[in-house]
Amino acid sequence: MPTINQLIRKKRKSTGKKRTAPALEKCPQRRGVCTRVSTTTPKKPNSALRKIARVRLTNGMEVTAYIPGIGHNLQEHSVVLVRGGRVKDLPGVRYQVVRGALDTAGVEDRAQGRSKYGTKKG
């Protein structure tokens, strides 16, 4: 515990904020190429086959991104747009693929929340 005089001489150092999506390097999204598309199982109370893609970004980093929505058309060498946003029940997945951008098709027959899944009206 510092004394009052020590605090006057040298202020307390604040701990900086931890970045949630460091691979994007302060960009809102990044383009990348899929190196592997697969499924994985979530953490303990949940059970499913979640679709994920390993993506090499334009800055050279390789990240694991979640593919949201029902069904997708991604395969190896697909060019995708990646945004930040973790998936709570998948450890190590801190990015998501943007649906309806570049090689990623939007979700078919989506009626509500269409803007999040790249689906046109009608």
UniProtKB/Swiss-Prot annotation:
Keywords: Methylation, Ribonucleoprotein, Ribosomal protein, RNA-binding, rRNA-binding, tRNA-binding. It comes from the Bacteria. The modification 3-methylthioaspartic acid is found at residue 89. Residues 1-24 are annotated as: Disordered. Pfam families: Ribosom_S12_S23. The keyword RNA-binding applies. GO terms for biological process: translation. GO terms for molecular function: rRNA binding; structural constituent of ribosome; tRNA binding. Residues 8-20 have a biased composition (Basic residues). Disulfide bonds: none annotated. GO terms for cellular component: small ribosomal subunit. SUPFAM superfamilies: Nucleic acid-binding proteins. InterPro entries: NA-bd_OB-fold, Ribosomal_uS12, Ribosomal_uS12_bac. Belongs to the universal ribosomal protein uS12 family. NCBIfam families: rpsL_bact. With S4 and S5 plays an important role in translational accuracy. Interacts with and stabilizes bases of the 16S rRNA that are involved in tRNA selection in the A site and with the mRNA backbone. Located at the interface of the 30S and 50S subunits, it traverses the body of the 30S subunit contacting proteins on the other side and probably holding the rRNA structure together. The combined cluster of proteins S8, S12 and S17 appears to hold together the shoulder and platform of the 30S subunit. Part of the 30S ribosomal subunit. Contacts proteins S8 and S17. May interact with IF1 in the 30S initiation complex. This is Small ribosomal subunit protein uS12. The gene is rpsL.
